[in-house]
Amino acid sequence: MRLNRSVPPCTVIPVLIYPDPGAAADWVSKAFGFTIRLRIANHRIQMKAGDGCFTIAEGTVAPNSSHLIQVRIENADGHCERARQNGAIILTEPQDQPYGERQYNAEDFCGHRWDFTETIADIAPEEWSGGAFHLE
């Protein structure tokens, strides 16, 4: 894949719609610790989340959105507390999962749902009934 400095280097780039991209970028930066990669005028902002990325675009927020953004983090408990202190609605508190992750779910100020996951152990899929067919 060729790289273009104007486009995030990620293979999958979720785009989240917010009525005010600047306010959204500021909020997710403060609440979830993401950083701005590139600001395009006042209507589109590319964000970095560790080695992942997503884009915030201007538009009308659709009700009953059918997406969830999963972000790999370190320290789920601390991250959850930071999100809560900055106004995130915590849907599920951090919990250990049988597949080796500690996860929590949050909703941001526009109703976007986020799943934050911290690896706590390397568990083979067959140990938790993951049914893996191809792992690299």
Locations of the language-model features?
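Conserved short beta-strand elements that form part of the metal-binding/catalytic scaffold
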Residues: T35-H67, R113-E118
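Positions that flank functional sites
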Residues: H43-R44, P98-Y99, E126
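Vicinal oxygen chelate
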Residues: D20-G22, I69-R113, I120
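Short secondary-structure boundary/capping segments
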Residues: L3-S6, I45-Q46, T60-V61, D96
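Conserved acetyl-CoA-binding loop of GNAT-fold acetyltransferases
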Residues: K30-R37, G87-I89
